[in-house]
């Protein structure tokens, strides 16, 4: 992450742009077409282990530095994938694993603090990818939320790229959030929500097979 939190203290847009260009050159040399960067989470709880990966606690600063990272990456032909969308950086007690429950953030705070850097990423910098987060909001997992992945992201922000899940975020809809009874219904929920790519290396039984069953059962239409 190139000492992300330290870089925010300098607020050096040119430096971030240069970091992005070097990152893109190295990624291109390896044959990559996209990269899961930048992290646009807002640092709020110092107990959270990923605070060091954030640009800071100010949405303006995070948005401005994030824009430079995105433009630097995409100028070199690499697709930027900002993460983690959305309201991810305030887990209960600062713990990152089994506490991915509703962060209890008011709508106004969500908009002006946690979503603002992402708005800039899509509307100002033209990011072509985004990663959905593990947590839920108001009881609905973000990775299965039509409100976040379609209404806000595509209809409001005008996002035209792909939505990729964080690792196992799809499975967590059943195993952690427990809002669906089986993987077939999970597959239907995430597809209807607006997810395009699932991130995880696992057997077909974990997603491909349930997805086929959901389509055969009419839970996912051809139009979707």
Give residue spans per PLM region.
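Glycoside hydrolase catalytic-domain context in secreted enzymes
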Residues: 1-224
